A protein has these predicted regions:
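Contiguous beta-strand/loop segments that form the cofactor/metal-binding neighborhood of enzyme cores
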Residues: 1, 188-258, 287-299
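N-terminal Rossmann-like dinucleotide-binding module
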Residues: 1-53, 292
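C-terminal helix-rich "cap/oligomerization" subdomain common to oxidoreductases
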Residues: 1-6, 73-75, 222, 293-330
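Beta-loop-alpha module in the N-terminal Rossmann-like domain of NAD(P)-dependent dehydrogenases
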Residues: 23, 53-116
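Hydrophobic residues in well-ordered beta-strands that form the structural core
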Residues: 59, 98-99, 124-126, 252
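Rossmann-fold dehydrogenase core element
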Residues: 111-129, 148-152
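Predominantly a Rossmann-like dinucleotide-binding segment in NAD(P)-dependent oxidoreductases
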Residues: 130-202, 207, 325
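Active-site loop of classical SDR/Rossmann-like NAD(P)-dependent oxidoreductases
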Residues: 276-289
Length: 330
Protein backbone atom coordinates (compact mmCIF):
# COMPACT_ATOMS: atom_id res chain seq x y z
CA UNK A 1 0.00 0.00 0.00
CA UNK A 2 1.24 3.48 -0.88
CA UNK A 3 2.11 5.84 1.95
CA UNK A 4 0.32 9.19 2.17
CA UNK A 5 0.62 11.01 -1.14
CA UNK A 6 2.29 14.04 0.43
CA UNK A 7 5.16 11.81 1.58
CA UNK A 8 5.76 10.04 -1.72
CA UNK A 9 8.93 10.73 -3.68
CA UNK A 10 7.88 12.33 -6.95
CA UNK A 11 9.66 10.85 -9.97
CA UNK A 12 10.23 11.98 -13.52
CA UNK A 13 11.64 9.84 -16.34
CA UNK A 14 13.93 11.32 -18.97
CA UNK A 15 13.19 9.31 -22.15
CA UNK A 16 10.63 6.78 -23.35
CA UNK A 17 13.27 4.08 -23.95
CA UNK A 18 12.09 0.48 -23.61
CA UNK A 19 13.60 0.04 -20.14
CA UNK A 20 11.57 3.05 -18.96
CA UNK A 21 8.43 0.90 -19.06
CA UNK A 22 9.92 -1.57 -16.58
CA UNK A 23 11.04 1.15 -14.21
CA UNK A 24 7.72 2.99 -14.52
CA UNK A 25 5.98 -0.18 -13.34
CA UNK A 26 8.41 -0.38 -10.44
CA UNK A 27 7.72 3.22 -9.41
CA UNK A 28 3.99 2.56 -9.53
CA UNK A 29 4.39 -0.57 -7.37
CA UNK A 30 6.76 1.05 -4.87
CA UNK A 31 5.23 2.05 -1.56
CA UNK A 32 7.09 5.33 -1.26
CA UNK A 33 7.16 6.68 -4.82
CA UNK A 34 4.90 8.04 -7.54
CA UNK A 35 5.53 8.63 -11.23
CA UNK A 36 4.59 12.20 -12.06
CA UNK A 37 6.21 13.12 -15.37
CA UNK A 38 7.74 11.73 -18.55
CA UNK A 39 9.86 13.56 -21.13
CA UNK A 40 10.72 12.65 -24.70
CA UNK A 41 12.31 14.43 -27.63
CA UNK A 42 8.85 15.25 -29.00
CA UNK A 43 5.68 16.24 -27.20
CA UNK A 44 3.68 13.78 -29.30
CA UNK A 45 5.79 10.81 -28.18
CA UNK A 46 5.77 11.92 -24.56
CA UNK A 47 2.00 12.42 -24.57
CA UNK A 48 1.35 9.01 -26.13
CA UNK A 49 3.61 7.30 -23.58
CA UNK A 50 2.01 9.22 -20.70
CA UNK A 51 -1.48 8.21 -21.80
CA UNK A 52 -0.48 4.57 -22.15
CA UNK A 53 1.15 4.45 -18.70
CA UNK A 54 -1.19 6.85 -16.86
CA UNK A 55 1.47 9.47 -16.18
CA UNK A 56 -0.01 12.90 -15.32
CA UNK A 57 2.51 15.17 -17.05
CA UNK A 58 4.22 14.84 -20.44
CA UNK A 59 7.05 17.06 -21.62
CA UNK A 60 8.41 17.27 -25.15
CA UNK A 61 11.76 18.48 -23.86
CA UNK A 62 14.19 16.98 -21.34
CA UNK A 63 15.27 20.36 -20.02
CA UNK A 64 11.71 21.41 -19.21
CA UNK A 65 11.17 18.27 -17.14
CA UNK A 66 14.30 18.99 -15.11
CA UNK A 67 12.95 22.49 -14.44
CA UNK A 68 9.79 21.06 -12.84
CA UNK A 69 10.22 22.07 -9.20
CA UNK A 70 7.68 19.49 -8.02
CA UNK A 71 9.96 16.55 -8.92
CA UNK A 72 12.31 14.99 -6.39
CA UNK A 73 14.05 12.24 -8.39
CA UNK A 74 14.88 11.57 -12.02
CA UNK A 75 15.41 8.24 -13.77
CA UNK A 76 17.67 8.53 -16.83
CA UNK A 77 17.46 5.66 -19.38
CA UNK A 78 19.10 7.62 -22.19
CA UNK A 79 22.02 6.20 -24.21
CA UNK A 80 25.28 6.06 -22.20
CA UNK A 81 26.84 8.89 -24.19
CA UNK A 82 24.14 11.22 -22.81
CA UNK A 83 24.27 10.17 -19.16
CA UNK A 84 26.86 12.68 -17.98
CA UNK A 85 25.22 15.73 -19.56
CA UNK A 86 21.77 15.06 -18.17
CA UNK A 87 22.84 13.70 -14.79
CA UNK A 88 24.92 16.80 -14.13
CA UNK A 89 22.09 19.02 -15.35
CA UNK A 90 19.65 17.25 -13.03
CA UNK A 91 22.02 17.48 -10.06
CA UNK A 92 22.52 21.21 -10.59
CA UNK A 93 18.75 21.61 -10.25
CA UNK A 94 18.63 19.65 -7.02
CA UNK A 95 17.25 16.40 -8.47
CA UNK A 96 18.35 13.01 -7.15
CA UNK A 97 19.44 10.77 -10.05
CA UNK A 98 18.95 7.09 -10.78
CA UNK A 99 20.93 6.58 -13.98
CA UNK A 100 20.74 3.52 -16.18
CA UNK A 101 23.89 1.45 -16.57
CA UNK A 102 26.59 1.77 -17.68
CA UNK A 103 26.85 4.87 -15.52
CA UNK A 104 28.64 6.81 -18.26
CA UNK A 105 30.60 6.55 -21.50
CA UNK A 106 33.82 6.25 -19.48
CA UNK A 107 35.14 6.58 -15.94
CA UNK A 108 36.12 10.24 -16.35
CA UNK A 109 32.52 11.13 -17.11
CA UNK A 110 31.34 8.89 -14.28
CA UNK A 111 33.60 10.74 -11.84
CA UNK A 112 32.25 14.08 -13.06
CA UNK A 113 28.71 12.83 -12.46
CA UNK A 114 29.49 11.63 -8.95
CA UNK A 115 31.24 14.91 -8.13
CA UNK A 116 28.31 16.97 -9.41
CA UNK A 117 25.80 15.00 -7.36
CA UNK A 118 27.93 15.23 -4.24
CA UNK A 119 28.49 18.97 -4.64
CA UNK A 120 24.76 19.56 -5.08
CA UNK A 121 23.72 17.31 -2.20
CA UNK A 122 21.78 14.75 -4.24
CA UNK A 123 21.88 10.97 -4.45
CA UNK A 124 23.40 9.16 -7.43
CA UNK A 125 22.84 5.46 -8.08
CA UNK A 126 23.21 3.34 -11.20
CA UNK A 127 20.39 1.12 -12.42
CA UNK A 128 21.90 -2.26 -11.57
CA UNK A 129 18.79 -4.00 -10.27
CA UNK A 130 20.09 -7.39 -9.14
CA UNK A 131 21.99 -5.97 -6.16
CA UNK A 132 18.63 -4.95 -4.66
CA UNK A 133 17.07 -8.43 -4.78
CA UNK A 134 16.53 -10.24 -1.48
CA UNK A 135 18.49 -13.15 -2.92
CA UNK A 136 21.58 -10.96 -3.22
CA UNK A 137 21.56 -10.24 0.51
CA UNK A 138 21.09 -13.95 1.21
CA UNK A 139 24.00 -14.86 -1.07
CA UNK A 140 26.19 -12.28 0.63
CA UNK A 141 25.54 -13.94 3.98
CA UNK A 142 26.48 -17.32 2.53
CA UNK A 143 29.85 -16.17 1.19
CA UNK A 144 31.28 -16.63 4.66
CA UNK A 145 30.52 -20.36 4.44
CA UNK A 146 32.75 -20.79 1.39
CA UNK A 147 36.04 -20.41 3.26
CA UNK A 148 38.66 -18.09 1.80
CA UNK A 149 37.34 -16.69 -1.47
CA UNK A 150 39.74 -17.53 -4.31
CA UNK A 151 37.87 -17.27 -7.64
CA UNK A 152 34.91 -15.48 -9.18
CA UNK A 153 33.62 -16.30 -12.66
CA UNK A 154 30.81 -14.35 -14.32
CA UNK A 155 29.15 -14.35 -17.74
CA UNK A 156 26.35 -12.42 -19.39
CA UNK A 157 25.59 -12.99 -23.07
CA UNK A 158 22.76 -13.17 -25.57
CA UNK A 159 22.71 -13.85 -29.29
CA UNK A 160 21.95 -11.49 -32.15
CA UNK A 161 21.35 -13.43 -35.35
CA UNK A 162 21.25 -10.14 -37.25
CA UNK A 163 22.78 -6.96 -35.86
CA UNK A 164 19.97 -4.39 -35.44
CA UNK A 165 21.17 -1.13 -36.96
CA UNK A 166 18.79 0.96 -34.85
CA UNK A 167 19.87 -0.47 -31.47
CA UNK A 168 22.00 1.76 -29.25
CA UNK A 169 24.08 -1.28 -28.22
CA UNK A 170 25.44 -1.36 -31.78
CA UNK A 171 26.21 2.36 -32.06
CA UNK A 172 29.73 3.45 -31.06
CA UNK A 173 28.72 7.13 -31.08
CA UNK A 174 26.25 6.34 -28.26
CA UNK A 175 28.87 4.38 -26.26
CA UNK A 176 27.36 1.02 -27.18
CA UNK A 177 29.05 -2.35 -26.89
CA UNK A 178 28.80 -5.59 -24.94
CA UNK A 179 31.02 -4.55 -22.04
CA UNK A 180 28.90 -1.56 -21.07
CA UNK A 181 25.64 -3.35 -21.73
CA UNK A 182 26.41 -6.81 -20.31
CA UNK A 183 29.92 -6.98 -18.91
CA UNK A 184 29.12 -4.12 -16.53
CA UNK A 185 27.00 -6.62 -14.58
CA UNK A 186 29.83 -9.15 -14.50
CA UNK A 187 32.31 -6.59 -13.22
CA UNK A 188 29.83 -5.52 -10.55
CA UNK A 189 29.38 -9.15 -9.45
CA UNK A 190 33.15 -9.53 -9.10
CA UNK A 191 33.47 -6.33 -7.05
CA UNK A 192 30.47 -7.42 -4.96
CA UNK A 193 32.15 -10.71 -4.09
CA UNK A 194 35.73 -9.53 -3.46
CA UNK A 195 34.77 -6.10 -2.07
CA UNK A 196 37.83 -4.38 -3.49
CA UNK A 197 39.34 -3.28 -6.76
CA UNK A 198 41.58 -5.53 -8.87
CA UNK A 199 45.26 -4.70 -9.10
CA UNK A 200 45.49 -5.44 -12.83
CA UNK A 201 43.38 -6.74 -15.72
CA UNK A 202 43.75 -8.27 -19.16
CA UNK A 203 41.08 -8.51 -21.85
CA UNK A 204 40.54 -9.51 -25.45
CA UNK A 205 37.56 -8.43 -27.54
CA UNK A 206 36.13 -8.85 -31.02
CA UNK A 207 34.60 -5.84 -32.74
CA UNK A 208 31.71 -5.49 -35.16
CA UNK A 209 30.02 -2.30 -36.39
CA UNK A 210 32.49 -0.30 -34.31
CA UNK A 211 31.61 -1.73 -30.88
CA UNK A 212 33.00 -4.56 -28.78
CA UNK A 213 30.76 -7.45 -29.85
CA UNK A 214 32.22 -9.75 -27.22
CA UNK A 215 34.89 -9.49 -24.55
CA UNK A 216 36.64 -11.86 -22.16
CA UNK A 217 38.69 -10.65 -19.24
CA UNK A 218 40.92 -11.71 -16.36
CA UNK A 219 41.10 -9.64 -13.19
CA UNK A 220 43.83 -10.12 -10.59
CA UNK A 221 43.38 -9.24 -6.93
CA UNK A 222 45.65 -9.17 -3.90
CA UNK A 223 46.32 -12.48 -2.09
CA UNK A 224 46.47 -14.47 -5.34
CA UNK A 225 42.75 -14.13 -6.04
CA UNK A 226 41.53 -14.17 -9.65
CA UNK A 227 38.27 -13.39 -11.43
CA UNK A 228 37.29 -14.12 -15.01
CA UNK A 229 34.37 -12.79 -17.01
CA UNK A 230 32.94 -12.77 -20.50
CA UNK A 231 30.14 -10.93 -22.23
CA UNK A 232 28.86 -10.71 -25.77
CA UNK A 233 26.10 -10.48 -28.32
CA UNK A 234 27.05 -13.75 -30.05
CA UNK A 235 26.21 -16.55 -27.59
CA UNK A 236 22.92 -17.89 -26.27
CA UNK A 237 21.52 -16.35 -23.09
CA UNK A 238 23.82 -16.83 -20.11
CA UNK A 239 23.58 -14.76 -16.93
CA UNK A 240 25.44 -16.63 -14.21
CA UNK A 241 28.26 -16.31 -11.74
CA UNK A 242 30.22 -18.56 -9.42
CA UNK A 243 32.13 -17.59 -6.29
CA UNK A 244 34.60 -20.31 -5.27
CA UNK A 245 36.24 -20.61 -1.88
CA UNK A 246 38.52 -23.06 -0.13
CA UNK A 247 35.54 -24.95 1.37
CA UNK A 248 32.67 -24.59 -1.11
CA UNK A 249 31.37 -22.59 -4.04
CA UNK A 250 28.24 -20.55 -4.67
CA UNK A 251 26.53 -20.69 -8.07
CA UNK A 252 23.74 -18.46 -9.37
CA UNK A 253 22.54 -19.14 -12.90
CA UNK A 254 20.30 -16.09 -13.41
CA UNK A 255 21.85 -13.37 -11.30
CA UNK A 256 21.00 -10.37 -13.48
CA UNK A 257 17.27 -11.11 -13.72
CA UNK A 258 15.73 -14.05 -11.83
CA UNK A 259 13.74 -16.43 -13.99
CA UNK A 260 10.64 -15.72 -11.91
CA UNK A 261 9.42 -12.89 -9.69
CA UNK A 262 7.82 -15.52 -7.46
CA UNK A 263 11.09 -17.09 -6.31
CA UNK A 264 14.84 -16.92 -6.92
CA UNK A 265 17.45 -19.61 -6.41
CA UNK A 266 21.14 -20.27 -5.96
CA UNK A 267 23.27 -23.25 -4.96
CA UNK A 268 26.09 -23.97 -2.55
CA UNK A 269 28.33 -26.78 -3.84
CA UNK A 270 30.48 -28.44 -1.20
CA UNK A 271 30.37 -31.74 0.64
CA UNK A 272 26.61 -31.55 0.11
CA UNK A 273 24.85 -29.60 -2.62
CA UNK A 274 22.40 -27.13 -1.15
CA UNK A 275 19.71 -25.28 -3.06
CA UNK A 276 18.51 -22.01 -1.56
CA UNK A 277 15.42 -20.06 -2.59
CA UNK A 278 13.81 -16.76 -1.72
CA UNK A 279 10.15 -15.86 -1.86
CA UNK A 280 8.48 -13.41 -4.22
CA UNK A 281 10.56 -10.33 -4.95
CA UNK A 282 10.61 -7.72 -7.72
CA UNK A 283 14.15 -6.38 -7.72
CA UNK A 284 13.41 -3.16 -9.58
CA UNK A 285 10.71 -2.29 -7.03
CA UNK A 286 13.25 -2.83 -4.25
CA UNK A 287 15.63 -0.53 -6.12
CA UNK A 288 13.06 2.25 -6.38
CA UNK A 289 12.01 1.86 -2.76
CA UNK A 290 15.61 1.93 -1.58
CA UNK A 291 16.41 5.01 -3.64
CA UNK A 292 13.23 6.77 -2.54
CA UNK A 293 13.96 5.96 1.11
CA UNK A 294 17.34 7.67 0.76
CA UNK A 295 15.64 10.74 -0.69
CA UNK A 296 13.07 10.78 2.12
CA UNK A 297 15.68 10.37 4.84
CA UNK A 298 17.95 13.09 3.42
CA UNK A 299 20.86 10.85 4.45
CA UNK A 300 22.77 10.34 1.22
CA UNK A 301 24.62 7.07 0.58
CA UNK A 302 27.74 7.93 -1.46
CA UNK A 303 28.80 4.28 -1.65
CA UNK A 304 26.30 3.75 -4.50
CA UNK A 305 28.08 6.31 -6.66
CA UNK A 306 31.47 5.00 -5.54
CA UNK A 307 30.81 1.43 -6.68
CA UNK A 308 29.36 2.65 -9.98
CA UNK A 309 32.45 4.76 -10.67
CA UNK A 310 34.70 1.83 -9.73
CA UNK A 311 32.76 -0.43 -12.09
CA UNK A 312 33.42 2.07 -14.87
CA UNK A 313 37.12 2.24 -13.94
CA UNK A 314 37.44 -1.54 -14.33
CA UNK A 315 35.51 -1.48 -17.62
CA UNK A 316 37.82 1.23 -18.95
CA UNK A 317 40.87 -0.81 -17.94
CA UNK A 318 39.50 -3.90 -19.70
CA UNK A 319 38.94 -1.97 -22.93
CA UNK A 320 42.38 -0.38 -22.66
CA UNK A 321 43.95 -3.81 -22.19
CA UNK A 322 42.30 -5.12 -25.34
CA UNK A 323 43.37 -2.08 -27.34
CA UNK A 324 46.96 -2.27 -26.11
CA UNK A 325 47.19 -6.06 -26.12
CA UNK A 326 48.74 -6.15 -22.67
CA UNK A 327 47.98 -6.21 -18.95
CA UNK A 328 46.77 -2.90 -17.50
CA UNK A 329 47.46 -1.97 -13.88
CA UNK A 330 44.88 -0.18 -11.80
Amino acid sequence: MKTESKNLVRWGILSTANIATKVARAINLAENAELVAIASRTEERATAWAQKHNVPIAYGNYDVLLSDSSLDAIYIPLPPSMHAEWTISAAERGKHVLCEKPLAADSDEATMMADACRQNGVQLMDGVMWVHHERTAMMKQKLGDLGELRRVTAAFTFSWNTIPTDNIRAKPELAGGSLGDLGYYCVRAILWAFEEMPTKVFATARYKVGVDFNLAGILWFDDDRIATMDCGFDTSLRKWFEVAGTKASLVCDDFTVPTSEESARFWIHGSENEKHETGACIQEVNMIERFSAIVQSKNLEPEWADVAVNTMRVCDALLESDQRGEIVNL
